[in-house]
Design a protein with these regions (language model features):
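C-terminal binding/interaction regions
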Residues: 78-152
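Glycine-rich phosphate-binding loop
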Residues: 32-71
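Short, ordered loop/turn segments at secondary-structure junctions
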Residues: 20-22, 49-50, 71-74, 100-101
Protein backbone atom coordinates (compact mmCIF):
# COMPACT_ATOMS: atom_id res chain seq x y z
CA UNK A 1 0.00 0.00 0.00
CA UNK A 2 3.05 2.23 0.28
CA UNK A 3 2.97 2.61 -3.51
CA UNK A 4 -0.44 4.29 -3.23
CA UNK A 5 0.93 6.74 -0.70
CA UNK A 6 3.89 7.53 -2.98
CA UNK A 7 1.56 8.36 -5.89
CA UNK A 8 -0.66 10.56 -3.73
CA UNK A 9 2.40 12.41 -2.39
CA UNK A 10 3.76 12.83 -5.94
CA UNK A 11 0.50 14.49 -6.97
CA UNK A 12 0.28 16.58 -3.81
CA UNK A 13 -3.05 15.11 -2.72
CA UNK A 14 -3.87 15.17 0.99
CA UNK A 15 -4.56 11.70 2.33
CA UNK A 16 -4.54 9.60 5.44
CA UNK A 17 -3.03 6.19 5.99
CA UNK A 18 -4.33 3.87 8.69
CA UNK A 19 -4.79 0.22 9.56
CA UNK A 20 -8.24 -1.33 9.83
CA UNK A 21 -9.08 -5.04 9.79
CA UNK A 22 -12.49 -6.39 8.87
CA UNK A 23 -11.91 -9.45 11.05
CA UNK A 24 -9.68 -8.24 13.88
CA UNK A 25 -11.00 -4.71 14.45
CA UNK A 26 -14.63 -4.73 13.26
CA UNK A 27 -15.67 -1.89 15.59
CA UNK A 28 -12.88 0.28 14.18
CA UNK A 29 -13.96 -0.67 10.65
CA UNK A 30 -17.56 0.36 11.29
CA UNK A 31 -16.58 3.66 12.89
CA UNK A 32 -14.09 4.48 10.13
CA UNK A 33 -16.48 3.73 7.27
CA UNK A 34 -19.55 5.31 8.81
CA UNK A 35 -17.71 8.57 9.56
CA UNK A 36 -15.88 8.77 6.22
CA UNK A 37 -18.30 11.19 4.56
CA UNK A 38 -18.59 13.57 7.51
CA UNK A 39 -14.78 13.61 7.76
CA UNK A 40 -14.57 14.78 4.15
CA UNK A 41 -13.15 11.64 2.57
CA UNK A 42 -13.98 11.36 -1.13
CA UNK A 43 -12.42 8.00 -2.05
CA UNK A 44 -11.15 5.10 0.04
CA UNK A 45 -8.38 2.76 -1.10
CA UNK A 46 -8.54 -0.47 0.90
CA UNK A 47 -5.89 -3.16 0.60
CA UNK A 48 -6.57 -6.63 1.91
CA UNK A 49 -5.06 -10.10 1.69
CA UNK A 50 -6.50 -13.54 2.23
CA UNK A 51 -10.29 -13.43 2.55
CA UNK A 52 -10.17 -9.69 1.73
CA UNK A 53 -13.47 -8.62 3.23
CA UNK A 54 -12.26 -5.11 4.08
CA UNK A 55 -13.03 -3.27 0.80
CA UNK A 56 -16.51 -4.78 0.53
CA UNK A 57 -17.37 -4.12 4.14
CA UNK A 58 -16.30 -0.50 3.80
CA UNK A 59 -18.37 -0.17 0.61
CA UNK A 60 -21.39 -1.58 2.43
CA UNK A 61 -21.10 1.10 5.12
CA UNK A 62 -20.48 4.25 3.06
CA UNK A 63 -21.59 5.84 -0.19
CA UNK A 64 -18.19 7.10 -1.33
CA UNK A 65 -16.16 5.14 -3.92
CA UNK A 66 -14.05 2.29 -2.57
CA UNK A 67 -11.10 0.90 -4.49
CA UNK A 68 -9.97 -2.56 -3.44
CA UNK A 69 -6.36 -3.69 -3.72
CA UNK A 70 -5.91 -7.46 -3.47
CA UNK A 71 -2.70 -8.13 -1.55
CA UNK A 72 -0.48 -11.17 -1.92
CA UNK A 73 0.24 -12.50 1.56
CA UNK A 74 2.02 -15.46 3.11
CA UNK A 75 -1.29 -17.23 3.75
CA UNK A 76 -2.93 -16.45 0.41
CA UNK A 77 -3.02 -18.21 -2.91
CA UNK A 78 -0.60 -15.78 -4.60
CA UNK A 79 -3.22 -13.07 -4.09
CA UNK A 80 -5.78 -14.76 -6.33
CA UNK A 81 -8.09 -15.52 -3.40
CA UNK A 82 -7.94 -11.85 -2.43
CA UNK A 83 -8.68 -10.73 -5.99
CA UNK A 84 -11.68 -13.01 -6.32
CA UNK A 85 -13.03 -11.97 -2.94
CA UNK A 86 -12.88 -8.28 -3.85
CA UNK A 87 -14.32 -8.52 -7.36
CA UNK A 88 -17.25 -10.77 -6.43
CA UNK A 89 -19.31 -8.18 -4.60
CA UNK A 90 -23.10 -8.48 -4.58
CA UNK A 91 -25.31 -6.10 -6.52
CA UNK A 92 -25.55 -2.74 -4.78
CA UNK A 93 -22.15 -2.93 -3.06
CA UNK A 94 -19.67 -1.82 -5.74
CA UNK A 95 -15.93 -2.01 -5.20
CA UNK A 96 -13.57 -0.92 -7.96
CA UNK A 97 -10.68 -3.37 -8.08
CA UNK A 98 -7.14 -3.18 -9.41
CA UNK A 99 -4.58 -5.90 -10.06
CA UNK A 100 -2.94 -7.87 -7.26
CA UNK A 101 -0.49 -5.69 -5.31
CA UNK A 102 -1.11 -2.73 -7.63
CA UNK A 103 -1.69 -0.02 -5.05
CA UNK A 104 -0.15 2.56 -7.40
CA UNK A 105 -2.96 2.03 -9.92
CA UNK A 106 -5.49 2.26 -7.10
CA UNK A 107 -4.11 5.69 -6.24
CA UNK A 108 -4.18 6.74 -9.90
CA UNK A 109 -7.82 5.64 -10.14
CA UNK A 110 -8.62 7.60 -6.99
CA UNK A 111 -6.91 10.64 -8.50
CA UNK A 112 -9.03 10.33 -11.64
CA UNK A 113 -12.17 10.31 -9.51
CA UNK A 114 -10.99 13.35 -7.57
CA UNK A 115 -9.94 15.14 -10.78
CA UNK A 116 -13.56 15.21 -11.94
CA UNK A 117 -14.03 18.14 -9.55
CA UNK A 118 -10.45 19.48 -9.53
CA UNK A 119 -9.11 21.05 -12.77
CA UNK A 120 -5.59 21.41 -11.33
CA UNK A 121 -5.42 17.71 -10.51
CA UNK A 122 -6.85 16.93 -13.94
CA UNK A 123 -3.96 18.81 -15.56
CA UNK A 124 -1.42 17.01 -13.37
CA UNK A 125 -2.88 13.69 -14.55
CA UNK A 126 -2.69 14.81 -18.19
CA UNK A 127 0.98 15.74 -17.69
CA UNK A 128 1.58 12.34 -16.06
CA UNK A 129 -0.01 10.56 -19.05
CA UNK A 130 2.10 12.62 -21.44
CA UNK A 131 5.23 11.65 -19.52
CA UNK A 132 4.29 7.95 -19.72
CA UNK A 133 3.70 8.34 -23.47
CA UNK A 134 7.11 9.96 -23.95
CA UNK A 135 8.82 7.29 -21.85
CA UNK A 136 7.21 4.56 -23.94
CA UNK A 137 8.48 6.15 -27.16
CA UNK A 138 11.96 6.99 -25.86
CA UNK A 139 13.51 3.68 -27.00
CA UNK A 140 12.62 4.64 -30.58
CA UNK A 141 15.44 7.18 -30.42
CA UNK A 142 17.75 4.17 -30.61
CA UNK A 143 18.51 3.38 -34.30
CA UNK A 144 18.40 -0.35 -33.52
CA UNK A 145 14.62 -0.04 -33.14
CA UNK A 146 14.11 1.27 -36.69
CA UNK A 147 13.48 -1.14 -39.54
CA UNK A 148 13.77 -0.59 -43.27
CA UNK A 149 11.14 -3.20 -44.01
CA UNK A 150 7.67 -3.60 -42.48
CA UNK A 151 7.53 -6.36 -39.89
CA UNK A 152 4.58 -8.08 -41.54
Amino acid sequence: MEAAREVLVEFGVPHEFTIVSAHRTPDRLYAYAQKAVQRGLQVIIAGAGGASHLPGMIASLTTIPVIGVPIRSSHSLAGLDSLLSIVQMPKGVPVATVAIDNAANAALLALRILALQDPTLHEKLRAFQKRLHEEALAPLQNPDYHFDQPLL
